[in-house]
Amino acid sequence: MTLLNVCGLSHHYAHGGFSGKHQHQAVLNNVSLTLKSGETVALLGRSGCGKSTLARLLVGLESPSQGNISWHGESLAKLNRAQRKAFRRDIQMVFQDSISAVNPRKTVREILREPMRHLLSLKKSEQLARASEMLKAVDLDDSVLDKRPPQLSGGQLQLVCLARALAVEPKLLILDEAVSNLDLVLQAGVIRLLKKLQQQFGTACLFITHDLRLVERFCQRVMVMDNGQIAETQAVGDKLTFSSDAGRVLQNAVLPAFPVRRRTSEKV
Protein backbone atom coordinates (compact mmCIF):
# COMPACT_ATOMS: atom_id res chain seq x y z
CA MET A 1 0.00 0.00 0.00
CA THR A 2 1.33 3.44 -0.95
CA LEU A 3 1.66 5.78 2.02
CA LEU A 4 3.27 8.81 0.44
CA ASN A 5 3.28 9.95 -3.16
CA VAL A 6 5.28 12.94 -4.38
CA CYS A 7 4.71 14.25 -7.90
CA GLY A 8 6.67 16.99 -9.70
CA LEU A 9 7.84 18.69 -6.51
CA SER A 10 9.86 21.89 -6.94
CA HIS A 11 10.82 24.44 -4.33
CA HIS A 12 12.72 27.70 -4.15
CA TYR A 13 13.56 30.35 -1.58
CA ALA A 14 13.29 34.07 -2.24
CA HIS A 15 16.16 36.36 -1.25
CA GLY A 16 16.11 40.15 -1.26
CA GLY A 17 18.73 41.82 -3.44
CA PHE A 18 20.36 45.25 -3.23
CA SER A 19 18.02 46.49 -5.96
CA GLY A 20 15.00 45.53 -3.88
CA LYS A 21 14.03 42.75 -6.26
CA HIS A 22 13.59 39.22 -4.96
CA GLN A 23 15.94 36.58 -6.29
CA HIS A 24 14.85 32.95 -6.33
CA GLN A 25 17.21 30.16 -5.33
CA ALA A 26 16.00 26.79 -6.62
CA VAL A 27 16.46 23.99 -4.09
CA LEU A 28 14.32 21.17 -5.53
CA ASN A 29 13.50 20.53 -9.17
CA ASN A 30 10.72 18.18 -10.31
CA VAL A 31 11.14 15.53 -7.59
CA SER A 32 8.83 12.50 -7.72
CA LEU A 33 8.86 9.48 -5.40
CA THR A 34 6.68 6.97 -3.58
CA LEU A 35 6.95 5.32 -0.18
CA LYS A 36 5.05 2.14 0.66
CA SER A 37 3.90 0.81 4.00
CA GLY A 38 6.59 -1.04 5.95
CA GLU A 39 9.48 -0.38 3.57
CA THR A 40 12.80 1.27 4.35
CA VAL A 41 14.07 3.73 1.76
CA ALA A 42 17.25 5.79 1.79
CA LEU A 43 17.59 9.27 0.37
CA LEU A 44 21.31 9.51 -0.27
CA GLY A 45 23.18 12.65 -1.21
CA ARG A 46 25.89 15.11 -0.37
CA SER A 47 25.30 18.02 2.02
CA GLY A 48 23.39 20.84 0.36
CA CYS A 49 21.73 18.73 -2.35
CA GLY A 50 18.19 19.38 -1.05
CA LYS A 51 17.57 16.34 1.18
CA SER A 52 16.56 18.24 4.32
CA THR A 53 14.37 20.68 2.39
CA LEU A 54 12.52 17.73 0.87
CA ALA A 55 12.03 16.23 4.33
CA ARG A 56 10.53 19.48 5.66
CA LEU A 57 8.09 19.53 2.75
CA LEU A 58 7.11 15.90 3.28
CA VAL A 59 6.09 16.47 6.91
CA GLY A 60 4.27 19.71 6.10
CA LEU A 61 6.66 22.15 7.78
CA GLU A 62 6.79 24.08 4.50
CA SER A 63 4.61 24.20 1.39
CA PRO A 64 6.18 23.42 -2.00
CA SER A 65 6.51 26.07 -4.68
CA GLN A 66 5.16 23.58 -7.21
CA GLY A 67 3.96 19.97 -7.31
CA ASN A 68 1.88 17.80 -5.03
CA ILE A 69 2.37 15.60 -1.96
CA SER A 70 -0.29 12.99 -1.21
CA TRP A 71 -0.74 10.93 1.96
CA HIS A 72 -2.95 7.85 1.54
CA GLY A 73 -4.11 9.36 -1.75
CA GLU A 74 -5.13 12.71 -0.22
CA SER A 75 -3.27 15.89 -1.15
CA LEU A 76 -1.70 17.58 1.89
CA ALA A 77 -2.93 20.92 0.57
CA LYS A 78 -6.55 19.72 0.80
CA LEU A 79 -6.53 18.02 4.21
CA ASN A 80 -9.15 19.24 6.65
CA ARG A 81 -8.38 19.88 10.31
CA ALA A 82 -9.07 16.33 11.49
CA GLN A 83 -7.11 14.82 8.60
CA ARG A 84 -4.15 17.12 9.27
CA LYS A 85 -4.06 16.06 12.92
CA ALA A 86 -4.05 12.41 11.86
CA PHE A 87 -1.29 13.18 9.36
CA ARG A 88 0.88 14.79 12.06
CA ARG A 89 0.46 11.64 14.13
CA ASP A 90 1.15 9.24 11.27
CA ILE A 91 4.37 10.86 10.03
CA GLN A 92 7.14 11.75 12.47
CA MET A 93 10.62 13.13 11.92
CA VAL A 94 13.89 12.90 13.85
CA PHE A 95 16.31 15.72 13.06
CA GLN A 96 20.09 15.70 12.97
CA ASP A 97 20.35 18.57 15.47
CA SER A 98 18.64 17.10 18.51
CA ILE A 99 19.54 20.09 20.70
CA SER A 100 17.48 22.45 18.53
CA ALA A 101 14.62 19.93 18.29
CA VAL A 102 13.73 20.06 22.01
CA ASN A 103 12.95 22.68 24.62
CA PRO A 104 16.00 22.79 26.95
CA ARG A 105 13.78 23.81 29.89
CA LYS A 106 11.57 20.74 29.62
CA THR A 107 12.32 17.43 31.31
CA VAL A 108 12.60 14.26 29.26
CA ARG A 109 9.24 13.21 30.71
CA GLU A 110 7.62 16.39 29.38
CA ILE A 111 9.37 16.07 26.01
CA LEU A 112 8.08 12.53 25.54
CA ARG A 113 4.54 13.42 26.61
CA GLU A 114 4.24 16.44 24.32
CA PRO A 115 3.22 14.66 21.08
CA MET A 116 0.98 12.29 23.02
CA ARG A 117 -0.90 15.20 24.63
CA HIS A 118 -1.60 16.81 21.27
CA LEU A 119 -2.03 13.81 18.98
CA LEU A 120 -3.39 10.93 21.08
CA SER A 121 -6.40 10.48 23.36
CA LEU A 122 -4.55 9.08 26.36
CA LYS A 123 -4.91 9.74 30.06
CA LYS A 124 -1.91 11.22 31.85
CA SER A 125 -1.14 7.89 33.51
CA GLU A 126 -1.20 6.19 30.09
CA GLN A 127 1.10 8.85 28.65
CA LEU A 128 3.58 8.35 31.48
CA ALA A 129 3.49 4.58 31.04
CA ARG A 130 4.14 4.89 27.31
CA ALA A 131 6.97 7.37 27.91
CA SER A 132 8.68 4.81 30.11
CA GLU A 133 8.00 2.08 27.55
CA MET A 134 9.53 4.12 24.72
CA LEU A 135 12.64 4.86 26.75
CA LYS A 136 13.16 1.16 27.31
CA ALA A 137 12.67 0.57 23.58
CA VAL A 138 15.62 2.87 22.82
CA ASP A 139 17.78 1.35 25.57
CA LEU A 140 17.39 4.19 28.07
CA ASP A 141 15.98 3.80 31.58
CA ASP A 142 13.66 5.87 33.74
CA SER A 143 16.59 7.61 35.42
CA VAL A 144 16.63 10.16 32.57
CA LEU A 145 12.94 11.09 32.88
CA ASP A 146 13.55 14.01 35.25
CA LYS A 147 16.65 15.24 33.45
CA ARG A 148 16.74 18.15 31.02
CA PRO A 149 18.50 18.15 27.62
CA PRO A 150 21.68 19.91 28.85
CA GLN A 151 22.15 17.08 31.36
CA LEU A 152 22.21 14.41 28.64
CA SER A 153 24.93 13.37 26.23
CA GLY A 154 24.39 13.99 22.52
CA GLY A 155 23.73 10.30 21.97
CA GLN A 156 21.20 10.10 24.81
CA LEU A 157 19.34 13.17 23.56
CA GLN A 158 19.14 11.75 20.04
CA LEU A 159 17.66 8.55 21.48
CA VAL A 160 15.13 10.63 23.44
CA CYS A 161 14.10 12.34 20.17
CA LEU A 162 13.69 8.92 18.56
CA ALA A 163 11.58 7.72 21.50
CA ARG A 164 9.42 10.85 21.23
CA ALA A 165 8.79 10.20 17.53
CA LEU A 166 7.90 6.56 18.16
CA ALA A 167 5.58 7.35 21.09
CA VAL A 168 2.65 8.10 18.77
CA GLU A 169 3.26 4.92 16.73
CA PRO A 170 3.76 6.65 13.36
CA LYS A 171 3.23 4.93 10.04
CA LEU A 172 6.24 6.72 8.55
CA LEU A 173 9.41 7.76 10.36
CA ILE A 174 11.75 10.21 8.63
CA LEU A 175 15.30 10.24 9.96
CA ASP A 176 17.17 13.29 8.68
CA GLU A 177 20.85 12.52 9.30
CA ALA A 178 19.58 11.41 12.69
CA VAL A 179 22.59 9.25 13.58
CA SER A 180 25.32 11.27 11.87
CA ASN A 181 26.53 12.84 15.12
CA LEU A 182 26.76 9.50 16.93
CA ASP A 183 29.91 7.42 17.18
CA LEU A 184 30.09 4.17 15.23
CA VAL A 185 29.11 1.96 18.15
CA LEU A 186 26.00 4.03 18.88
CA GLN A 187 25.15 4.20 15.16
CA ALA A 188 25.25 0.42 14.90
CA GLY A 189 23.09 0.11 18.01
CA VAL A 190 20.49 2.54 16.66
CA ILE A 191 20.31 0.64 13.36
CA ARG A 192 19.70 -2.64 15.22
CA LEU A 193 17.04 -0.92 17.30
CA LEU A 194 15.27 0.56 14.26
CA LYS A 195 15.16 -2.83 12.56
CA LYS A 196 13.63 -4.33 15.69
CA LEU A 197 11.07 -1.56 16.07
CA GLN A 198 10.18 -1.69 12.39
CA GLN A 199 9.44 -5.40 12.68
CA GLN A 200 7.39 -4.76 15.81
CA PHE A 201 5.32 -1.79 14.58
CA GLY A 202 5.54 -2.16 10.78
CA THR A 203 6.66 1.45 10.44
CA ALA A 204 7.99 2.67 7.10
CA CYS A 205 11.28 4.59 7.28
CA LEU A 206 12.81 7.26 5.06
CA PHE A 207 16.48 7.37 5.98
CA ILE A 208 18.09 10.64 4.83
CA THR A 209 21.86 10.38 4.86
CA HIS A 210 25.14 10.85 3.00
CA ASP A 211 26.57 7.67 4.54
CA LEU A 212 26.43 4.62 2.26
CA ARG A 213 27.23 2.24 5.14
CA LEU A 214 23.92 3.05 6.78
CA VAL A 215 22.09 2.48 3.50
CA GLU A 216 23.59 -0.97 3.01
CA ARG A 217 22.79 -2.05 6.57
CA PHE A 218 19.28 -0.69 6.89
CA CYS A 219 17.53 -0.01 3.57
CA GLN A 220 15.74 -1.95 0.85
CA ARG A 221 15.79 0.82 -1.74
CA VAL A 222 17.94 3.92 -2.26
CA MET A 223 17.34 7.16 -4.11
CA VAL A 224 20.35 9.32 -4.95
CA MET A 225 19.75 13.07 -4.87
CA ASP A 226 21.98 15.60 -6.61
CA ASN A 227 21.40 19.32 -7.12
CA GLY A 228 17.78 19.11 -6.04
CA GLN A 229 16.85 16.20 -8.30
CA ILE A 230 16.57 12.42 -7.95
CA ALA A 231 19.53 11.22 -10.01
CA GLU A 232 18.71 7.50 -9.76
CA THR A 233 16.87 4.84 -7.76
CA GLN A 234 18.34 1.42 -6.97
CA ALA A 235 17.36 -1.67 -5.01
CA VAL A 236 19.82 -2.39 -2.20
CA GLY A 237 21.40 -5.79 -2.74
CA ASP A 238 24.61 -7.64 -1.98
CA LYS A 239 26.53 -5.48 -4.44
CA LEU A 240 25.15 -1.97 -4.71
CA THR A 241 26.42 -0.18 -7.82
CA PHE A 242 25.40 3.33 -8.89
CA SER A 243 25.20 4.69 -12.41
CA SER A 244 25.00 8.41 -11.59
CA ASP A 245 28.06 10.58 -10.94
CA ALA A 246 26.67 11.60 -7.54
CA GLY A 247 26.16 7.98 -6.53
CA ARG A 248 29.63 6.94 -7.60
CA VAL A 249 31.23 9.81 -5.67
CA LEU A 250 29.50 8.69 -2.48
CA GLN A 251 30.31 5.04 -3.16
CA ASN A 252 34.00 5.82 -3.57
CA ALA A 253 34.21 7.74 -0.30
CA VAL A 254 36.48 6.02 2.20
CA LEU A 255 34.64 5.37 5.46
CA PRO A 256 35.46 3.14 8.43
CA ALA A 257 33.57 -0.11 8.73
CA PHE A 258 30.77 -0.61 11.22
CA PRO A 259 31.85 -2.33 14.43
CA VAL A 260 30.90 -5.99 14.53
CA ARG A 261 29.99 -7.76 17.76
CA ARG A 262 32.40 -10.49 18.76
CA ARG A 263 30.98 -13.88 19.47
CA THR A 264 31.30 -14.95 23.06
CA SER A 265 33.39 -17.93 21.95
CA GLU A 266 35.97 -15.72 20.26
CA LYS A 267 39.10 -14.92 22.19
CA VAL A 268 40.35 -11.37 22.42
UniProtKB/Swiss-Prot annotation:
Organism expressing this protein natively: Shigella flexneri
Source species taxonomy: Bacteria, Pseudomonadati, Pseudomonadota, Gammaproteobacteria, Enterobacterales
InterPro entries named among the record's database cross-references: AAA+_ATPase, ABC_transp_ATP-bind, ABC_transporter-like_ATP-bd, ABC_transporter-like_CS, Nickel_NikE, P-loop_NTPase
Claim: Membrane is one of the keywords in the record: yes
Cellular component GO terms held in the UniProt record: plasma membrane
Originating gene: nikE
Subunit structure, interactors included: The complex is composed of two ATP-binding proteins (NikD and NikE), two transmembrane proteins (NikB and NikC) and a solute-binding protein (NikA).
Protein purpose: Part of the ABC transporter complex NikABCDE involved in nickel import. Responsible for energy coupling to the transport system.
Name this polypeptide is given: Nickel import ATP-binding protein NikE
CDD domains assigned: ABC_NikE_OppD_transporters (cd03257)
Keywords from the named record: ATP-binding, Cell inner membrane, Cell membrane, Ion transport, Membrane, Nickel, Nickel transport, Nucleotide-binding, Translocase, Transport
